[in-house]
Amino acid sequence: MADSAQAQKLVYLVTGGCGFLGEHVVRMLLQREPRLGELRVFDQHLGPWLEELKTGPVRVTAIQGDVTQAHEVAAAVAGAHVVIHTAGLVDVFGRASPKTIHEVNVQGTRNVIEACVQTGTRFLVYTSSMEVVGPNTKGHPFYRGNEDTPYEAVHRHPYPCSKALAEWLVLEANGRKVRGGLPLVTCALRPTGIYGEGHQIMRDFYRQGLRLGGWLFRAIPASVEHGRVYVGNVAWMHVLAARELEQRATLMGGQVYFCYDGSPYRSYEDFNMEFLGPCGLRLVGARPLLPYWLLVFLAALNALLQWLLRPLVLYAPLLNPYTLAVANTTFTVSTDKAQRHFGYEPLFSWEDSRTRTILWVQAATGSAQ
């Protein structure tokens, strides 16, 4: 921030601060943002772990609220210097309706932007997603791409559609005059597949393996690579972006950045086994054990069952047409834009990230070997 802000302690607001990424952003701010005076944590469901944070030198204010309620968002934003908007509904399994996904991800983001404009908060960092870009509905690979790589971003699934629209709203808002007449400065960060402590989907895969007797069966060719990024490094990138957004407003304002680190490019299944293997699971098959057409059929069948059962019961299997398409499409990024624009370097090495994640899976599932 500018010199005028250096003398004062700053007020940060993290929306979705009790979510998977949000909790890591909150803890990272407390550890590594020396100018922090007050940290507001806004979420619909407040975690009990927040209480332990209230004994430190920084004032931690827990605010229970809903991003779809404009008045609640405006009250939380008022007086904040910086907003890190991580709140969002990540649902690729059909647990929520398309309407709910849109309300949270799009209307919620619109509410945050309007709250910044109305209250005079000038700096907004938005958590976007790689799925704003792809994989697209045509299954086109994105191989070692960067923020400027041409790619036909065509989506039908409610989640990537909602994130794409929300990101557009954030970038379009850059430069809008806020209360007091100064411009709003925004940027968006696009994590690839996030892993690490608190990753619910990793836990779901572990439980699925247990139900199958400790085995997981290869469904996707090992040659289909995915870029993954450790949650601690994603949180660190958010902290750095928020810190530098004022001094580098001309450079960073209205920009998007892929989140990246030293995690290796591997297939989704092979990457997961880096953590699930030490927890006792085994991946069967050097090649997929089922033909792809059969997976397509099973995914379509799951989608049909989900539609038929929706009035009666929630049926949200891991395999559906969208998750199959994503898992079966190469999507890797290779960029240094965040380093060039605001000095980002990964805080955690691959070895450290891997160890931390393994220990979490073992502790969370009681599977320590």
UniProtKB/Swiss-Prot annotation:
GO terms for cellular component: endoplasmic reticulum membrane; lipid droplet. Its main location: endoplasmic reticulum. The active site is at Y159. Pathway: Lipid metabolism; steroid biosynthesis. Gene3D superfamilies: NAD(P)-binding Rossmann-like Domain. One of its GO terms (molecular function) is 3-beta-hydroxy-Delta5-steroid dehydrogenase (NAD+) activity. It is a multi-pass membrane protein. It is linked to Congenital bile acid synthesis defect 1: A primary defect in bile synthesis leading to progressive liver disease. Clinical features include neonatal jaundice, severe intrahepatic cholestasis, cirrhosis. PANTHER family: 3 BETA-HYDROXYSTEROID DEHYDROGENASE TYPE 7 (PTHR10366:SF847), NAD DEPENDENT EPIMERASE/DEHYDRATASE (PTHR10366). This is 3 beta-hydroxysteroid dehydrogenase type 7. It comes from Homo sapiens (Human).
